[in-house]
Amino acid sequence: MLRAGAPTAGSFRTKEVHTGTTIMAVEFDGGVVVGSDSRVSAGEAVVNRVFDKLSPLHQRIFCALSGSAADAQAIADMAAYQLELHGLELEEPPLVLAAANVVKNISYKYREDLLAHLIVAGWDQREGGQVYGTMGGMLIRQPFTIGGSGSSYIYGYVDAAYKPGMTSEECRRFTTNAITLAMNRDGSSGGVIYLVTITVAGVDHRVILGDELPKFYDE
């Protein structure tokens, strides 16, 4: 028997599916690390526990998705299509800055219709590893950036823990710790952690399962 006020199967149909999220990207000398949690929710329901929020835009360029799952993926798909054409016209891979500008322009053009925030990160021969935030049509390069609902819980940690000149392994550890802390505090973040490391050598994908996440004293 359903109790009063309990969500029903039909009630979830009107709820927009959100990647209530923690996303992050960090530059290091020679590349970038991009990471995210994997929980997707619709209202009070978790509709996907292992959704990969790191979407490829080109060979060595990825974006991290947050906001409405459909809107964020639509922006990523449109950007990937434009960058594929851009690369064919130039006969060389597009620059990370070009990819970030494409995402920024799409986000701004459809700002009244789409609810999404994407972080663009990757490697190119001109500038090496780069991280760009694109919220609301803004474009800014940063040594690291965070986003999503879980990010509000970890600003203090990332500001204190970030050190210029970190290695790729230190950046992976930094990203893993930050996302784990956000998952512990934010009810909309959870699941596993996806990590992508992008360098001149290629793209390295890793998945950190729940029983492999770092432990903190407050757990």
Swiss-Prot record:
Q: Propeptide residues, per UniProt? A: 1-20
Instruction: Indicate where this protein resides in the cell.
Output: Cytoplasm; Nucleus
UniProt xrefs under SUPFAM superfamilies: N-terminal nucleophile aminohydrolases (Ntn hydrolases)
Catalytic residues (positions): T21
Key word DNA repair present in the record? no
Ranges that cross the membrane:
none
Q: How is it modified after translation?
A: Autocleaved. The resulting N-terminal Thr residue of the mature subunit is responsible for the nucleophile proteolytic activity.
Q: Which UniProt keywords apply?
A: Acetylation, Cytoplasm, Hydrolase, Immunity, Nucleus, Protease, Proteasome, Threonine protease, Zymogen
Q: Annotated site (Cleavage), which positions? A: G20, T21
Q: Which GO terms describe its molecular function?
A: threonine-type endopeptidase activity
**Protein origin, superkingdom:** Eukaryota
Give Gene Ontology CC terms: cytosol; nucleoplasm; proteasome core complex; proteasome core complex, beta-subunit complex; spermatoproteasome complex
Point out residues bearing the modification N6-acetyllysine: K53, K109
Cite the EC number: 3.4.25.1
First-tier enzyme category under EC: hydrolase
One GO BP annotation here? immune system process
What Gene3D superfamilies does the entry give? Glutamine Phosphoribosylpyrophosphate, subunit 1, domain 1
Q: What induces it?
A: Up-regulated by interferon gamma (at protein level).
- Enumerate the catalysed reactions: Cleavage of peptide bonds with very broad specificity
Broad class of the protein's primary localization: cytoplasm
Task: Tell me the function of this protein.
Answer: The proteasome is a multicatalytic proteinase complex which is characterized by its ability to cleave peptides with Arg, Phe, Tyr, Leu, and Glu adjacent to the leaving group at neutral or slightly basic pH. The proteasome has an ATP-dependent proteolytic activity. This subunit is involved in antigen processing to generate class I binding peptides.
One further remark on this entry is:
Encoded in the MHC class II region.
Q: Which family does it belong to?
A: Belongs to the peptidase T1B family.
The subunit structure is:
The 26S proteasome consists of a 20S proteasome core and two 19S regulatory subunits. The 20S proteasome core is composed of 28 subunits that are arranged in four stacked rings, resulting in a barrel-shaped structure. The two end rings are each formed by seven alpha subunits, and the two central rings are each formed by seven beta subunits. The catalytic chamber with the active sites is on the inside of the barrel. Component of the immunoproteasome, where it displaces the equivalent housekeeping subunit PSMB6.
| Name this protein carries in UniProt | Proteasome subunit beta type-9
